[in-house]
């Protein structure tokens, strides 16, 4: 690993004339070496170690070492082909489903299930059903029905059929009635606390022994609204080792008006009943779900067995641990209503809309979720891996510009006006050049110190004379880069004060970073990707009268 890291850091250091950018190097290391993406912590430790070695080398020594480590150039090794994930027991046509609750738009946690279902149905030429599980009226956000489908379209997930559970209540009633008639379910009017105490002891409640005929009468009264505070329970094993499986509920009364049905219905199925009926009737062959649903799988198998239905192939994958942005839909919604968040695409949120606004490309997220796959072990979501995959997508089209954040004005004496031409992209000459015109006054981001020498990138060396009233006064020293190296001068980027363009960059914490970009930044359009050198990749969001608004995508 050390030689690999060393090679990438050397390449980066040489590119920036002896001042390596470890974050940029990390992105390229992970982007071009997928086997290292699960070892981010170790890679960071090696980077810290290698940086100390590189700091002692001259540029010539760095180049010699790079030639030794990668004589044919980086990224030339043949990448070992990753074994493609597969489904077990594929017989005939594959049918799968993605089944979110329409309580809000999709977030990054939903991306795994939606992408993997899409991946497998495309791989096996199968069918993907989007099932909107909206039988809990209290959790439904009306606009989410459309938002979810928009999110899936953006992600590249192809849906063949859309099912809305609140439109299928009569179907669930039919199968609920059949379970009661067969003696596998009963109407229970026990107090919730009373039933819970009995269940914990493995003791059946008084309602369990009622005949199917008696239960059908109560069922009809439930539907007609003649009774309240009752539920339908499925008969399981009252002595089951897991108390939650003992006679779990499959229907309950809910008087909250539904966004789609209003008050037309008040008896609603619970998840384990509606999911099982739908999976059977829609012909699901394989069901992907988190391992936190293993107990639900066992509950649903009771219903499959009572009806004599074929049980689909269940695949339970590990939990995807995502740190950072807010993922709780209820917290996001509350924050939007209170004004804490600007909307569902606020940069602090983990929604797909927020990722999209920041500049994450769907193909990068899709690729990463397929790589994470269906392993049963829990997985930590590594943002570094997403950023590396995203950089692979956007880097080739991202024009380069200088951006000066928190700008400090520098007045330089003793230097002639000068024009320099820089390429818009180091590897794509067809994207053209950009022009910087030095006329004695520039902006820099760095805090400069009096008496020290600095190298202005692609220009010359200066020495700071004094700082007065927040203006830095410096004088021209020399053109030679070797002089800067011998004086251990920091290499800093800059832009001319004249014609500079105000830019606000919104970061992942929704903080505004104010600064200026060079004049040729004016060629960009909405949704363009740009790399602000030594700052990071940004997505251009909009042009305003006083400048541009961009979102920080990643470093």
From Swiss-Prot:
GO terms for cellular component: cytosol; protein-containing complex. It comes from the Archaea. GO terms for biological process: amide biosynthetic process; glutamyl-tRNA aminoacylation. GO terms for molecular function: ATP binding; glutamate-tRNA ligase activity. CDD domains: GluRS_non_core. It catalyses: tRNA(Glu) + L-glutamate + ATP = L-glutamyl-tRNA(Glu) + AMP + diphosphate. A motif ('HIGH' region) lies at residues 100-110. PROSITE patterns: AA_TRNA_LIGASE_I (PS00178). Its main location: cytoplasm. The keyword ATP-binding applies. InterPro entries: aa-tRNA-synth_I_CS, Gln/Glu-tRNA_Ligase, Glu-tRNA-synth_arc/euk, Glu/Gln-tRNA-synth, Glu/Gln-tRNA-synth_Ib_cat-dom, Glu/Gln-tRNA-synth_Ib_codon-bd, Rbsml_bL25/Gln-tRNA_synth_N, Ribosomal_bL25/Gln-tRNA_synth. Transmembrane segments: none annotated. Pfam families: tRNA-synt_1c, tRNA-synt_1c_C, tRNA-synt_1c_C2. It is found in: Cytoplasm. Keywords: Aminoacyl-tRNA synthetase, ATP-binding, Cytoplasm, Ligase, Nucleotide-binding, Protein biosynthesis. Its EC number is 6.1.1.17. PANTHER family: GLUTAMATE--TRNA LIGASE (PTHR43097:SF5), GLUTAMINE-TRNA LIGASE (PTHR43097). Catalyzes the attachment of glutamate to tRNA(Glu) in a two-step reaction: glutamate is first activated by ATP to form Glu-AMP and then transferred to the acceptor end of tRNA(Glu). Belongs to the class-I aminoacyl-tRNA synthetase family. Glutamate--tRNA ligase type 2 subfamily. This is Glutamate--tRNA ligase. It comes from Methanococcus maripaludis (strain C6 / ATCC BAA-1332). The gene is gltX.
